[in-house]
C-alpha cells in the first residue's frame, strides 16, 4: 500500500526556510518552495489599491507518518497564531518516480 503523501505547507513570505528546516529535522529529504499570493475575504487596501498577501508554499513528498509529525511541529512552531501563519494539508500520491520501481505498472 502506497503511503506517500504530498504535503503542502502555506506560510507568509519569508518563512519557507524555517519550514524546510523543520521538515528535514523530521525526515523529509527535500522540498520545493513556490512563491504565491494569498486571497482573503476582506482584502487590505491602501489609497484604494488592493494589497496582495505574499505567501510561500512548501511542497514535500513524504511518508504519511513523517507528514503527520511535520504537520504537528509546524502547528506548534509556525501555525496560524504565529507570524508565519502556517497552514498544512496533505493529499495522497498515487504514483511517482520515487516509487515506480517498487510497484509494477499495469495497463
Which positions does each model-derived feature cover?
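Positively charged, small/polar-rich N-terminal and surface patches that mediate targeting and assembly
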Residues: 1-107
Amino acid at each position: 500500500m502506497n503511503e506517500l503523501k504530498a504535503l503542502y505547507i502555506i506560510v507568509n513570505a519569508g518563512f519557507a526556510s524555517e519550514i524546510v528546516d523543520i521538515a528535514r529535522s523530521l525526515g523529509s529529504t527535500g522540498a520545493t518552495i513556490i512563491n504565491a499570493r494569498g486571497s482573503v475575504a476582506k482584502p487590505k487596501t491602501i489609497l484604494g489599491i488592493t494589497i496582495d498577501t505574499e505567501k510561500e508554499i512548501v511542497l514535500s513528498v513524504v511518508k504519511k507518518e513523517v507528514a503527520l509529525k511535520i504537520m504537528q511541529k509546524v502547528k506548534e512552531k509556525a501555525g496560524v497564531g504565529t507570524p508565519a501563519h502556517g497552514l498544512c494539508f496533505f493529499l495522497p500520491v498515487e504514483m511517482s518516480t520515487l516509487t515506480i520501481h517498487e510497484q509494477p505498472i499495469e495497463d
